[in-house]
C-alpha cells in the first residue's frame, strides 16, 4: 500500500526531530559548534568551517534528500526503513557518519 502524504510527513518529521535532539545533546555534552535551522521542509546544519548539510523532504516523491559536501543522496522509505536509492544504506547511520566527517561531531540516536 502506498504511503500517504500525511504518513510521509509524520515519518520525516520524526526523523528531523531525532536529528535536532541528538545535535542539541551534542552541543550540551561536546560543546559542539553547529547551527540548526529548521524551516518548512528543510533542516539545515551549518558547521564552524561554514560547510552545510541540508536535509529536505521531497513530498511528491516521498523521499528525503540530503546534500553534504561529499555529494547528494536520496532516501526512500522501504520496508520500514529509509534507504539510499543508490547503495541501500540506512538514513540515520548515514547522517551520523556525515555529521562526524563534515563537522567532527559524534551523534547518538
Swiss-Prot record:
Classification via InterPro entries: CyaY, Frataxin/CyaY, Frataxin/CyaY_sf, Frataxin_CS
Keyword Iron: yes
PROSITE patterns reported for this sequence: FRATAXIN_1, FRATAXIN_2
Protein keywords: Iron, Metal-binding
Keyword set includes Metal-binding: yes
SUPFAM superfamilies, A to Z: Frataxin/Nqo15-like
Pfam families per record: Frataxin_Cyay (PF01491)
Matches recorded under Gene3D superfamilies: Frataxin/CyaY
GO cellular component: cytosol
Single GO molecular function: ferrous iron binding
BP GO terms, sorted: iron-sulfur cluster assembly
Record family assignment: Belongs to the frataxin family.
Job description of the protein: Involved in iron-sulfur (Fe-S) cluster assembly. May act as a regulator of Fe-S biogenesis.
HAMAP family reported in the protein's UniProt record: CyaY
Protein's recorded name: Iron-sulfur cluster assembly protein CyaY
Organism listed in the record: Shewanella sp. (strain W3-18-1)
Amino acid at each position: 500500500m502506498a504511503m500517504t502524504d500525511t504518513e510521509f510527513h509524520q515519518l520525516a518529521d520524526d526523523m528531523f526531530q531525532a536529528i535536532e535532539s541528538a545535535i542539541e545533546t551534542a552541543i550540551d555534552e561536546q560543546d559542539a559548534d553547529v547551527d540548526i535551522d529548521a524551516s518548512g521542509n528543510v533542516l539545515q546544519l551549518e558547521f564552524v568551517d561554514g560547510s552545510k548539510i541540508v536535509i529536505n523532504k521531497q513530498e511528491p516523491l516521498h523521499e528525503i534528500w540530503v546534500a553534504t559536501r561529499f555529494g547528494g543522496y536520496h532516501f526512500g522509505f522501504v520496508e520500514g526503513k529509509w534507504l539510499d536509492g543508490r547503495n541501500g544504506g540506512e538514513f540515520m547511520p548515514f547522517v551520523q557518519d556525515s555529521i562526524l566527517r563534515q563537522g567532527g561531531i559524534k551523534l547518538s540516536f
